[in-house]
Amino acid sequence: MKKLVKFFLIISFSLVAWTSHACDFLDVPIGTSMTKLNDRYEGLVELDEEETDDTVYKYIYRAKDLCKDEELRNSYLLVFVQNLKLIGMRIEVLHEDLDKKDVYEFTKSNIGTLDDRAEKKNWFGTIQLDSLGNRYILFSKRKTFDSKLFETLLITESDYIELIYSPDVEEAM
């Protein structure tokens, strides 16, 4: 009987460890050199190391290419770069169904606790999450004019928030 219990415990813990993991790309420290990230993550655009200026560039990836989390399978990951350094990242998803909450579920289980009001179907807005260190984390949920749900999760540092939301951000191809 003890062997049977041990067997089920081992199987249970193995499956939990296998299925619950955070997107490790989101753990990359803000300010990390993009050349280091290119060595670590397949699929990132190779940046020209001689192209250093103060322009903020936005690169758009399918989140599932850099994150294996099930909640992010239909999301996009926007990577913000200035002077060849990572200054922020944002997960975005547009749902046809107002009841979906993939980014909310991902955030709640992998990033931090959200305000209780964010769980409500009819709540729309932005919440700043408590974070360790210099990280500035925002979760946002909005209803579009055509009744779709737009969820975002921004991870950056407070020094870069204005740069990321600046109209001068250039979308890189």
Predicted regions and their residues:
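Sec-dependent signal peptide recognition
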Residues: 2-10
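Repetitive helical segments and hydrophobic/amphipathic motifs
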Residues: 12-15
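Alpha-helical scaffolding within the catalytic cores
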Residues: 70-74
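Non-cytosolic coordination micro-motifs
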Residues: 21-60, 83, 88-173
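Hydrophobic/aromatic beta-strand elements that line small-molecule binding cavities or substrate pockets
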Residues: 75-80
